[in-house]
Amino acid sequence: MFDPSPARLPVTETPQIVVVGCGAIGLPLATAFAARGCDVLGVDTDPARLAALRAGRVGLIDEGLGDALATAVGAGRLAFTDTIAPADRPRAFILVVPTPVDTDGAPLLGNVEAGADAIVAAARDDDLLLVRATVPVGTTRRLAGIAAKQGRRLHLAACPDRSVAGRCFLEQFSVPHIVGGMNADATHAAVQLLARLGPTVAVSSPEVAEAAKLFANVQRDVTFALANQLALASDELALDFGEIVAAASEGYARFALARPGPVSGPCLTKDGALLAHSLSADRFGLARAARALNESLLDHVAQALARHVSALPRPVIAVLGLAFKGDPPTADRRGSFGVALADRLRADLAHATLRLGEPTSGQAAERDLDRAIAGADVAVIANDHPLIKALDPSWLARSLRGGGLIYDACCALAPVAQALPNAVTLRRIGGHFPAAMASKRAR
């Protein structure tokens, strides 16, 4: 492993930590540093978010974060502002802003560039600028060039966040932080900083750190796509995917598959595009095909639902699960399969009534899963929140209209050994999936 030993120590006193971007990733990170006793300033441009944070209110679902934020704000270790002002003390700036892509998959790096400009304008020489955002390979080095052109000598390093939504705060202390600086001094400064939270892995350059995050997410997208492809093949062959998987894996450790289902959210849906932007277009066919396959599940499910309700004059469809994933719970709906499915059904089935259910919703009506299900013709399981996953298929069947359909898009519900009451059909992509393998879906 790369040795980050510096020629000299660039930080000689405890720096103030300035986290630029206090959303779903930046806020848990800022709070984690404050929980370790650091002096932290969070910067964000959203007035409503700032007002809530100054009052110690989280505004998102993340295990352990609420209490830690209230404690840090109350103790004066964590404050918030909308601007970055110059200071007469060393500071470590951490850039944690969204990096979306456009409809063609091209990265939109305006947030990164604006944040970096604001940091460079306020920083002192030898301050640390740590790029925590997920960016195309080479972005940190480009930002170093921008800082140099403005006459600022900063220590730049990359360390993309790798935590899981819903457990981002806790994973700051457990998931290794992959750190790559522009030189040994920058790497050392970043390692010193992040070692306050948890384990670190020093690498030889920011490009290695940037690529490590993107490679991992592309691997997961491809892994899920393979499971989905084989599950769809099982459907076409009229075979039970779960039975095939159980038989093929019995006493045979060389075979393992993820659980099929939607692959959504703000990361896996676009990180492949960020990596592709760093490469020649003709070198990324497998990952592009995997992303297209995963996105095709929306068509597959929507068409199956349309066929089921085609003869009904006023069908009622309940979509359960609007967050992009359910376990660990999150309220984040960016890139959500459930939201996209609801939008698609509204467009394709104008005569249908949609009911939406989401346990993490701020709206009481959406949290009431019983209300969404009662008397519906179809119930779609669109994420694996524990409260949704715990629904008994037989109870669901009795709650639906006779001849109804339960479409478990996530393969989250318990297996059913016999016919369901009320002439209700339970359908999954590829059939059932062995319960013992369900944990392999976590992301």
Which residues does each PLM region occupy?
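Structural/interface elements that position substrates and couple domains in central-metabolism enzymes
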Residues: F2-R443
